[in-house]
C-alpha cells in the first residue's frame, strides 16, 4: 500500500533520496544493507550501529573500505550508558534490548545465548556530537526498540524526512507497541505511512514520511 506503490524498497530509495543523503541505520547486522547504501550513494554519509561483537566484526570487515560509512559499536536507546542485550545466535538476527516473549514460541528454533552488556547511546546525543543536523532516511531494524528510540530523540527525528522501521504485529518482545499503536505514535510527531510491507504474521516493515519537511 502507500502513495508510492512500490514493491521494492531499494528501488524506491534510489529514486527518492538525493545523491548525497545522510542515512542512519540501526541494527546493521552483517553490514549487507549498509554496503548497498554505501555503493549506491558514494557521495552520501551512512552512520551504522551494531552493538554485538560477532555481527559488528562481520560488518566492520565488510565496510571498512567505504569512506562514507561510520560504524559504531553501540545500540541506540533512550539513554546513553550501559544496556542489557538479550542475545541469540547471530544468524537469527533476533537479539534485542527488549526481553523476548512471543518470539520464544513463534520462533522456537532460535538459540538464545543469554544476557550481554552492551554500550547504548541516545541518537540525539550522537547526532549533536557528530554535527548531524538532518537525516534523509533512518533504516531501523532493532527487534522492538524502534519506537523507544524515535520517541527519545525528538530533535533529529523532527529533521528526518523518512523512517523505514520494523514493526510488530503481535508481541514478540516485552512492552513493544503493536502496529496500530506505533502508527498512532508516529502520526502524533508528524509522520504518515507511505508504504507497508507485512508479509509475515509476526513482524513487518513500514515506511513513514515526515509531512512537516
Which residues are covered by each model-predicted region?
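Phosphate/nucleotide-binding beta-alpha loop and adjacent structural elements of enzyme active sites
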Residues: 1-213
Amino acid at each position: 500500500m502507500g502513495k508510492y506503490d512500490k514493491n521494492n524498497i531499494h528501488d524506491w530509495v534510489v529514486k527518492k533520496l538525493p545523491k548525497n543523503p545522510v542515512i542512519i541505520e540501526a541494527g546493521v547486522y552483517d553490514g549487507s544493507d549498509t554496503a548497498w547504501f554505501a555503493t549506491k550513494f558514494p557521495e552520501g554519509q551512512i552512520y551504522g550501529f551494531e552493538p554485538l561483537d560477532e555481527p559488528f566484526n562481520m560488518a566492520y570487515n565488510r565496510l571498512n573500505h567505504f569512506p562514507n560509512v561510520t560504524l559504531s559499536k553501540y545500540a541506540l536507546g533512550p539513554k546513553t550508558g550501559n544496556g542489557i542485550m538479550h542475545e541469540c545466535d547471530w544468524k537469527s538476527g533476533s537479539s534485542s534490548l527488549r526481553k523476548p516473549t512471543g518470539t520464544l514460541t513463534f520462533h522456537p528454533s532460535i538459540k538464545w545465548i543469554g544476557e550481554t552488556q552492551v554500550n547504548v547511546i541516545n541518537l540525539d546525543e550522537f547526532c549533536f556530537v557528530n554535527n548531524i543536523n538532518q537525516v534523509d532516511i533512518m533504516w531501523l531494524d532493532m527487534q522492538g526498540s524502534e519506537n523507544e528510540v524515535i520517541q527519545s530523540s525528538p530533535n533529529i527525528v523532527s529533521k528526518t524526512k523518512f523512517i523505514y522501521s520494523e514493526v510488530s504485529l503481535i508481541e514478540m518482545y516485552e512492552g513493544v507497541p503493536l502496529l496500530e499503536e506505533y502508527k498512532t505514535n508516529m502520526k502524533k510527531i508528524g509522520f504518515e505511512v507511505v508504504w507497508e510491507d507485512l508479509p509475515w504474521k509476526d513482524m513487518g516493515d513500514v515506511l513513514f514520511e515526515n509531512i512537516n519537511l
